């Protein structure tokens, strides 16, 4: 999953396309995972919501800083470009927004797990319906054990995991197994 935005890139045209920002983006494994896993989950939830007369949901990706701050940082820009690629390929399923929590901390109040939880400008929030996950920016990168300097980008995998976590939670599945030696009276 982490093919398109890693810093040590195999630049063969078979796997990567250079985009207008100079990054190699839109890797097929990343897009296929979203297309084959998250899209059906979103469609299932939205079909149930439509039957109840409710509005359609999208996966909301919220950056906890002003747009200019996100673009100014090389690290946050990698994450942003990955999310923008998803939005470009799946505009009906992904929305991207920016909340400047330094000036409007109450805008993200509902994403705090407890009243003592802190959110920072380096957080990225993935939301779908009532489910959300808050990720720190450093989660999308690989670092050495004794250093905080990132040496590789692992964002595609973490973005995919976050999106699958919030979309799957809205459509829970229960399984019952029988005939494994238990009594079935």
Description of each model-found segment:
Residues 1-185:
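Short, surface-exposed patches at the edges or C-terminal ends of soluble domains, predominantly
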